[in-house]
Amino acid sequence: LVNGSNARNYTFGLENGAEFHQIASDGGFLEQPVALTSVTLTPGERAEIIVDLSGYAEGDTVKLMDGNATVLSLNVTEEADAQTALPQTLNEIPELVTDGAAVQRFTLSGMSFMVNINGSQFDMDRIDVEQHLNETVIWEVRNAQDMMGSMIHPFHIHGVQFQVLSRDGAEPPQNEQGWKDTIAVYPGETVRLAVTFSEKGVFMYHCHILEHEDNGMMGQVSVQ
C-alpha cells in the first residue's frame, strides 16, 4: 500500500473488520508481523500487509476499504495447492544508539500557503542543519498548534531511513518500529527520531503534503 496522494490520509481496513498483518513499512520488513484491523497512511507512507484468506470459500469477495470507499476487491478462487504460514521473525533491526546523542529540533507551523519549519520558509541557497556522516542524532519534530490551527504533517527525510523513538514520550506502535522515512506528526504532538546518514551530501526534509512542501515547509541538511 502506497499513499501517493498530495494531501489525503487513508485508513485501510477489511470490510468485515477482520484482522490482517502488517509485515513491512517504508524501509522494508518489520521484525515480526503486527496484527491490525486498520492502518493509517499519510502522504508518502507505505505498508505491506498480509490478508489470510484461509477462512473464506471459493466465490467469496474480500474488500479493502477506506471508510465507505472500496480500494481493492479480492476475489477468492480455488484452494491453493500449497499451504503457507506467516513467519514469526521477518527481520533483525539493530537499535540505533542514542545515549549522549545531539538533538535537533524542528517545529512545523501553519496551514495552507502560510507554512514554515522553525519560523523559516525554504531557501535553496540556505543550509538549515549540519550533521556528521554516520552520526546518530535525535530529530525532535513538533507539530505546533497556533492561531492558524493545525493538521497532520507527514514529515519526510531524503537520503535516510530512521527509527521512531517516541510519540509524546510514549513508545511508538509496533508497526512504526521498523525503518521509516516518513512519519505522521499529529497536531500538538512531538515525535523523536533516531537519524543516521550513511552518505554525504545535501538532503531535503519536508512535509509530504505537496501544497505545504511547495509553499516552503521544507529545509536542507548537509551531511559531511
Enumerate the predicted regions with their spans.
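Histidine- and aromatic-rich segments of cupredoxin/plastocyanin-like copper-binding domains
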Residues: 2-100
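Conserved catalytic-core segments centered on acid/base and nucleophilic motifs
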Residues: 1-2, 204
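Active-site pocket scaffolds in enzymes
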Residues: 21-34, 105-224
